[in-house]
């Protein structure tokens, strides 16, 4: 039934002049989620047309970010997504919508990343979505860091800390990357890295200690 529906949707998109994501791209994106969500990821990918920024010929970067989940499953998602955002939210189930937000939190467009991270943090995201939030915390768009800190500062962040405890290298490399962006872009605004929102995020919300 899933394959029949996927095939019908793909044909409709082709008739409308929009090519769906390839099977290879869909499989690559599915690797970023637990196996039990594979069917839901496929449904999401079936609804995403292959339209990219500047018409580049690939959906995502080759660089993959690997995370270990507490249940022992390993996931890997692309560093950057080059697909245009534009699928109406109403076509997805709640789980599919969360998957969509996760995917586009990796967009090459910072405004798109911010919008979808904000959507993920409107409530309590599922555990499998948290690696996508954690990854954005080591990046250079300070407005996104301020958004995340504003949402997490008053919450119980034990699941975020747990994910980092299972991925200590991600915690260390993410912290170092965040500090390097402060040094390169924001030192003139915050003379001490301890004043920087990224430092407060890692220390107060994720339990990082020097």
Which positions does each model-derived feature cover?
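Extended repeat-based scaffolds of very large eukaryotic assembly and lipid-transport proteins
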Residues: 2-115, 155-210
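Buried hydrophobic core positions in alpha-solenoid tandem helical repeats
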Residues: 99-102, 130-134
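Short coil turns that connect the paired helices of HEAT/ARM alpha-solenoid repeats
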Residues: 105-108, 137-143
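Helix-boundary capping/turn motifs
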Residues: 108, 121-126
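A short acidic, amphipathic alpha-helical/loop segment
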Residues: 115-119, 131-135
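Conserved hydrophobic register position within alpha-solenoid helical repeats
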Residues: 116-119, 144-149
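Residue-level signature of the C-terminal ends
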Residues: 122-123, 151, 155-158
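Helix-rich alpha-solenoid scaffolding regions
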Residues: 131, 137, 148-151
């Amino acid at each position: 039934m899933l394959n029949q529906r996927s095939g019908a949707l793909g044909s409709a998109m082709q008739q409308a002049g929009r090519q769906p994501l390839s099977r290879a791209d869909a499989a690559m994106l599915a690797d970023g989620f637990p196996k039990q969500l594979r069917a839901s990821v496929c449904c999401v990918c079936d609804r995403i047309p292959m339209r990219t920024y500047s018409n580049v010929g690939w959906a995502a970067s080759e660089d993959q970010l690997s995370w270990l989940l507490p249940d022992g499953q390993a996931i890997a998602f692309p560093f950057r997504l080059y697909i245009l955002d534009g699928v109406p939210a109403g076509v997805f189930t709640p789980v599919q919508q969360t998957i969509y937000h996760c995917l586009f939190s990796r967009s090459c467009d910072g405004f798109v990343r911010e919008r979808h991270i904000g959507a993920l943090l409107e409530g309590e995201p599922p555990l499998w979505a948290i690696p996508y939030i954690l990854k954005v915390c080591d990046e250079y768009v300070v407005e996104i860091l301020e958004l995340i800190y504003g949402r997490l500062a008053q919450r119980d962040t034990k699941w975020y800390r747990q994910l980092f405890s299972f991925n200590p290298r991600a915690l260390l490399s993410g912290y170092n990357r965040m500090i390097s962006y402060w040094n390169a872009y924001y030192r003139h605004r915050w003379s001490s890295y301890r004043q920087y929102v990224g430092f407060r995020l890692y220390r107060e919300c994720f339990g990082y200690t020097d």
